[in-house]
């Protein structure tokens, strides 16, 4: 009896070690597509597919956010909590933790390391720096932890990235200005995002490449709006005070504040390429006939829900793309419609298009705003 029991314990321990070792080796590269191919759409035809060994739930999942000082990030945190609270998702979660560390890259990496060391099963991250996480990815793989980056993703093919085509978004804004600013020339104001992030870099590159390829005579004045209405309104007001007149504007975020700065300064309305803030779209509709010709494009904060959904699918042993491509939400003048592309009765500080129907993710403003923005 003792011999049999010893054998069973030894066999069980060996099996457990083999399972942990297999998981800790990181994902296996396999053939696609994913089971949920509509949601988990690969970025390109060359995107590889990952598969981890199936892990029994319920799971401990953490959101390691960096910068928190704007509406998009606050709404993202609220959306993450709303998604985790859905009955079908909540049933799969033992714990859902949220922490925001600010602009400090080292602090964000330390938070991720803390989650790894604390035994979390997966971590989703909106990265403050696209290149600083390579050692963290290795530590996550060694510990059997799945790392999913979204929005500000990572310059790597060794972790899962979930995002829209951020460079393509910059190209869209650039093409709007080339198309709508007369004469293929002029002075443009580019309101950038948070310095050092992949989103700011990629959107900027997209805009500038389009302007260069247009063959036009463009002068660009850059200011840093940090994707925040208050900050953008101040730096745009300062730019107008110095330069007096711009022929077109692109703004990565803080679009409502940017237009309000133009109104306050009595700057003539010009073509603007901006994000998907409800307040921005209200203004685009209100002042369209006075010359405010807008394209409003971006990605809703609900991409955090897609990142969590991806992490759970990977933990359940499903095949997922290394890089998942999400669609953009785009509305252009003259197609701004109340109750459809913007909501006049809702706050300005709300990002419209905050849904991904192909992933079964569609939140109302009330569902999101009912959640807190605090760490949990």
Q: Which residue stretches match the model-derived regions?
A:
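Conserved, well-structured beta-alpha core segment at the onset of a catalytic domain
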Residues: 2-3, 19, 301
